[in-house]
């Protein structure tokens, strides 16, 4: 589809509501205004007008806003029609606009894509629009807004500028070897490189926090039947999300709850008790439990404290531990402290965290919440942060690796060309974040995940 087309879409959610908004962007937006409104509204003023059909009859009446390009969200001529939010009314108005020449329905994210292509937003800011809409906590929303306002991009652009400055010195030393310009003898290049590496590490740490706010952590509760897994899910969720009975195998399928701990999203997953299945339904539930375990960020190994005194997971259930992915973090949760008389709390056993609690009485559950927050390295004291996506983290990691390779060249045999190339690759990786260096395929994947009308 051409970016020269004029596009239209509903900007408000589908369904019944008090207000419904249609957004038009492109060269034909002026003609749409003339056809539907009978005139072109004054730029950037709210005008209360009837919205007319082709025969001149009114379809609706509401507020029209006219934003001539390039001073608009997309950088093109933009018309917004704010009418009543009934789906029939909006559908009639949308059909009316689509009868006009050169107008088509917008693809998901196409308004934001045009804003990016017309330099109204960089790619990180455009992604922040979707993240702001999808934010699941106040802290995530604030961080997404910071990204939309350019906080993340400013940090990245500062790094890119520093690398540009560094590359000038390095490439000058390569291009003019006879000019007696020795940038290495006084250690200035090494000092500048170390400064860039330090700044990049700080951005990476903040980006990891932003990624936690956006992606959250997937925690799977696993163990034998009747260990209290569903009771723990209910305790963490603060509601009766799962059925709890004394009957082994009550939970047959995967149950999911999304909670927040100090703004950090947690995806808590309760699974079927692991044992030899008694029927086909239970077998499928246990198979799904293992699928969730293999994709988890952390496993809470639930143990009924009344059945064993062991605290080492390898002693409690060797076969279970042997089947777990090698690098998967495990937290042993000894449940039913209210029955065993154990003191709720946390300790370390053979490299694993051990938490004693009672899911039934909630004793020790706060200890588990704090443990989950700390295990992900989430720092609530970081103010004014930004949200980051997986691709951002990968780009930052790639840049860091190239800088370390460049430093090795600098401190080793002084292979100037190789150092310059590593600096160029680091700069290219950072530029992918803001979209200065980005493939069309990546752009398509990013914007296709947006809402229609955004």
From Swiss-Prot:
Source organism superkingdom: Bacteria
Transmembrane regions: none
Keywords: Cytoplasm, GTP-binding, Hydrolase, Magnesium, Metal-binding, Nucleotide-binding, Potassium, tRNA processing
Residues binding GTP: 226-231, 245-251, 270-273, 335-338, 358-360
GO function terms (MF aspect): GTP binding; GTPase activity; metal ion binding
The protein's required cofactors: K(+)
Alphabetized CDD domains for the sequence: trmE, TrmE_N
Subcellular location per the Swiss-Prot or TrEMBL entry: Cytoplasm
UniProt xrefs under NCBIfam families: mnmE_trmE_thdF, PRK05291.1-3, small_GTP
Name the UniProt record assigns to this protein: tRNA modification GTPase MnmE
Organism: Cronobacter sakazakii (strain ATCC BAA-894) (Enterobacter sakazakii)
Gene name of the encoded protein: mnmE
């Amino acid at each position: 589809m051409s970016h020269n087309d004029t596009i239209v879409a509903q900007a408000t959610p589908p369904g019944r509501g008090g207000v419904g908004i249609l957004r038009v962007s492109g060269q034909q937006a002026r003609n749409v205004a003339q056809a539907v409104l009978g005139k072109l509204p004054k730029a950037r003023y709210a005008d209360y007008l009837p919205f007319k059909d082709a025969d001149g009859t009114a379809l609706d009446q509401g507020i029209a806003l006219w934003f001539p390009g390039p001073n608009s969200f997309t950088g093109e001529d933009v018309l917004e029609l704010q009418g009543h939010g009934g789906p029939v009314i909006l559908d009639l108005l949308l059909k009316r606009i689509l009868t006009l020449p050169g107008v088509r329905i917008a693809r998901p994210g196409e308004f934001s894509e045009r804003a990016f292509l017309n330099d109204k937003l960089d790619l990180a800011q455009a992604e922040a629009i979707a993240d702001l809409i999808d934010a699941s906590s106040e802290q995530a929303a604030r961080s997404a807004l910071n990204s939309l306002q350019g906080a993340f991009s400013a940090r990245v652009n500062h790094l890119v500028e520093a690398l540009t400055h560094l590359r000038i010195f390095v490439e000058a030393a390569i291009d003019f070897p006879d000019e007696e310009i020795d940038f290495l003898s006084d250690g200035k290049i090494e000092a500048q490189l170390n400064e860039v590496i330090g700044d990049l590490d700080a951005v990476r740490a903040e980006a990891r926090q932003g990624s936690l706010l956006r992606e959250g952590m997937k925690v799977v509760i696993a163990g034998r039947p009747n260990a209290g897994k569903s009771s723990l899910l209910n305790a963490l969720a603060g509601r009766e999300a799962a059925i709890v009975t004394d009957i082994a195998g009550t939970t047959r399928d995967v149950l999911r709850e999304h909670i927040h701990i100090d703004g950090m999203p947690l995806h808590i997953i309760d699974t079927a008790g692991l044992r030899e299945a008694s029927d086909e339904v239970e077998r499928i539930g246990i198979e799904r439990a293992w699928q969730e375990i293999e994709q988890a960020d952390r496993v809470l190994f639930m143990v009924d404290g009344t059945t064993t005194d062991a605290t080492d997971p390898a002693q409690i259930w060797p076969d279970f531990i042997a089947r777990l992915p090698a690098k998967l973090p495990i937290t042993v949760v000894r449940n039913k402290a209210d029955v065993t008389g154990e003191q709720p709390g946390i300790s370390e056993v053979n490299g694993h965290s051990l938490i004693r609690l009672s899911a039934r009485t909630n004793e020790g559950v706060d200890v588990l919440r704090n443990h989950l927050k700390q295990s992900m390295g989430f720092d609530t004291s970081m103010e004014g942060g930004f949200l980051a996506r997986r691709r951002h983290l990968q780009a930052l990691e790639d840049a860091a690796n190239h800088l370390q390779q460049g430093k090795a060249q600098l401190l080793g045999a002084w292979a100037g060309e190789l150092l310059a190339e590593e600096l160029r690759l680091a700069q290219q990786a950072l530029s992918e974040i803001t979209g200065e260096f980005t493939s069309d395929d990546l752009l398509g994947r990013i914007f296709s995940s947006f809402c229609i009308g955004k």
